[in-house]
Amino acid sequence: MLTEQQRRELDWEKTDGLMPVIVQHAVSGEVLMLGYMNPEALDRTIESGKVTFFSRTKQRLWTKGETSGNFLNVVSIAPDCDNDTLLVLANPIGPTCHKGTSSCFGDTAHQWLFLYQLEQLLAERKSADPETSYTAKLYASGSKRIAQKVGEEGVETALAATVHDRFELTNEASDLMYHLLVLLQDQDLDLTTVIENLRKRHQ
């Protein structure tokens, strides 16, 4: 979140009390929407952890998702170099746009975003009926079975690579990634944690 010094340095006078706010997906980097905040909206955003704007049409504070349930959960807030624009990184709950797309700028999602969406779906499957969901059945079988499936798919992926079968390699790699994501969820880990670890190693 913003430090106290950063909040003091925000140039509300320059923006006539309404500061433009760019909301970006914290995982994929996709630009989700543009809105405006006054000081009260910023306070509410920081206090609640959900993106809250000042609606210029309704002339009141408006929390994104207050009607639809499609909230934007705040990860971080940062000012630009001129202190007259804010960048909010957020994890969206559902589509951001009222038209049903992930972004108000159209369906511009990067392919990598699908992994995040798949991960969210796999997390929801934890509470599904094992009789109707393969993923729920996998969770119910326990960690050892899930880990075994990851091992099996890893071997099958490697075998497909050794015979240079690109079609089979694609299929087996897909199975491997799916089961690996299930295993991470089973262990209360997520893809973001793995990405952060890879980033640290790269440094």
Swiss-Prot record:
Keyword Amino-acid biosynthesis: yes
Catalytic activity, as annotated: 1-(5-phospho-beta-D-ribosyl)-ATP + H2O = 1-(5-phospho-beta-D-ribosyl)-5'-AMP + diphosphate + H(+); 1-(5-phospho-beta-D-ribosyl)-5'-AMP + H2O = 1-(5-phospho-beta-D-ribosyl)-5-[(5-phospho-beta-D-ribosylamino)methylideneamino]imidazole-4-carboxamide
Ribosomal protein among keywords: no
GO MF, one annotated term: phosphoribosyl-AMP cyclohydrolase activity
Gene3D superfamilies cross-referenced by the UniProt entry: MazG-like, Phosphoribosyl-AMP cyclohydrolase
SUPFAM superfamilies membership: all-alpha NTP pyrophosphatases, HisI-like
Stretches the record annotates as Phosphoribosyl-AMP cyclohydrolase: 1-114
Pathway involvement of the protein, from the record: Amino-acid biosynthesis; L-histidine biosynthesis; L-histidine from 5-phospho-alpha-D-ribose 1-diphosphate: step 2/9; Amino-acid biosynthesis; L-histidine biosynthesis; L-histidine from 5-phospho-alpha-D-ribose 1-diphosphate: step 3/9
EC numbers, comma separated: 3.5.4.19, 3.6.1.31
Entry GO CC: cytoplasm
InterPro entries noted in UniProt: His_synth_HisIE, HisE, PRib-ATP_PPHydrolase-like, PRib_AMP_CycHydrolase_dom, PRib_AMP_CycHydrolase_sf
Pfam families: PRA-CH (PF01502), PRA-PH (PF01503)
Keywords: Amino-acid biosynthesis, ATP-binding, Cytoplasm, Histidine biosynthesis, Hydrolase, Multifunctional enzyme, Nucleotide-binding
Superkingdom per UniProt: Bacteria
One GO biological process term: L-histidine biosynthetic process
Enzyme class: hydrolase
CDD domains per UniProt: NTP-PPase_HisIE_like (cd11534)
Annotated compartments: Cytoplasm
Region (Phosphoribosyl-ATP pyrophosphohydrolase), start-end ranges: 115-203
Family statement drawn from the similarity comment of this UniProt entry: In the N-terminal section; belongs to the PRA-CH family. In the C-terminal section; belongs to the PRA-PH family.
Record-linked NCBIfam families: histidine_hisI, PRK00051.1, PRK02759.1
Official protein name in the record: Histidine biosynthesis bifunctional protein HisIE
Gene name for this UniProt entry: hisI
